[in-house]
């Protein structure tokens, strides 16, 4: 299992507050039934969301779902 670092996620969304909010939004989507965009082995939704973000599967556009 590869470790996820904040630096990997900050390459995608440079603002750490926006990065946290984006990961939270995506984790909530996964927890209510959205299909993960990566292979996950019994990971928690927030871990899945952070891995997806580090792999550039989504970006700041997810924040538009809040507006």
Curated annotation (Swiss-Prot):
HAMAP family tied to this protein: RNApol_bact_RpoZ
UniProt-recorded name of the protein: DNA-directed RNA polymerase subunit omega
Catalytic reaction annotation: RNA(n) + a ribonucleoside 5'-triphosphate = RNA(n+1) + diphosphate
BP-aspect Gene Ontology terms: DNA-templated transcription
EC number: 2.7.7.6
Record key words, sorted: DNA-directed RNA polymerase, Nucleotidyltransferase, Transcription, Transferase
Species whose genome carries this gene: Nitrosomonas europaea (strain ATCC 19718 / CIP 103999 / KCTC 2705 / NBRC 14298)
One matching Pfam family: RNA_pol_Rpb6
Assembly and interaction partners: The RNAP catalytic core consists of 2 alpha, 1 beta, 1 beta' and 1 omega subunit. When a sigma factor is associated with the core the holoenzyme is formed, which can initiate transcription.
Function, in words: Promotes RNA polymerase assembly. Latches the N- and C-terminal regions of the beta' subunit thereby facilitating its interaction with the beta and alpha subunits.
UniProt similarity note: Belongs to the RNA polymerase subunit omega family.
One GO cellular component term: DNA-directed RNA polymerase complex
Top-rank EC class of the record's enzyme: transferase
